[in-house]
Swiss-Prot record:
Zn(2+) binds at H15, D18, H148. HAMAP family: MshB (MF_01696). This is 1D-myo-inositol 2-acetamido-2-deoxy-alpha-D-glucopyranoside deacetylase. It is an enzyme of class 3 (hydrolase). Keywords: Hydrolase, Metal-binding, Zinc. It comes from the Bacteria. InterPro entries: GlcNAc_PI_deacetylase-related (IPR003737), LmbE-like_dom_sf (IPR024078), Mycothiol_biosynthesis_MshB (IPR017810). It comes from Corynebacterium diphtheriae (strain ATCC 700971 / NCTC 13129 / Biotype gravis). Catalyzes the deacetylation of 1D-myo-inositol 2-acetamido-2-deoxy-alpha-D-glucopyranoside (GlcNAc-Ins) in the mycothiol biosynthesis pathway. GO terms for biological process: mycothiol biosynthetic process.
Amino acid sequence: MRDLIGFKAVAVHAHPDDEAIWTGGLLANLAARGADVTVVTCTLGEEGEVIGEPYQGLTNKNADQLGGFRIHELHKSLSLLGVRGEFLGGAGCWRDSGMIGDPANEHPRAFISSGDKSIEQLTEIFERLQPDLVITYGPDGGYGHPDHIRAHNITHTVAENMDIPRILWAVTPRTELEQGMAAITTLPSGWRRALPGEVACVDHVDLTIALDDHAFAAKAAAMRAHATQLWLADATISDVNPHAAIAGVADPKAAPLVFALSNLIAQPLLDIECYQLGGGTPLTSNDPTEGIR
């Protein structure tokens, strides 16, 4: 159903892979319906760890070339989602700040110190694209990462100055997350279960989007594209990570797939995405475009 031709959506994300993990299903759905969807990525994710042995030398402790490699992963992910992308200020303008207290916080290009310049850059993008819908994280950045919080702050500064019709915050629902974790019966070697409260989630959501087969498959494929950062326990192998992982699941509805970040904490890849209303026109249904088109 191509009912969104002329509709424009912009997602503002901190690092390559966030577009897939947090919003991949919604972005794929909007694009399939004809919307013009753009992902703005604020850094190259230079401070990330690397899953798999072949590209360990790219990390910031070695060649410090991970950011360039992640551009390649991001381009593949965006193509699989059917959306366009651009970097805030151009590729390499802002650097991944790392977690709170990391030495990367002090880098002269650290995104957390981007000041008014990043606001001006995002203003130019929003003025050029004129989005009907903007998607980012909540005030805590979803899980406290400084770059996610900075992405939230600049997005709201610009969107509120421009009177964007609707802003959504991507969140993880507690109930479905816990049900999915409980459904995972066996873990791949080396993986572990999350400790209580270790995976960020929320009790309240305003919008629950059920991902159809296309949107879920696109999201999973986009996540696989970020093989240095994400490991799906579906027997997938790649040149980045040549080791297959397989998880056992008691209830495939609760946990259609299982994945992990570089911390190897097993998480369910849910067949829903949840959002909170961050601003603008109130939601009237589980269609995030209703009331603003």
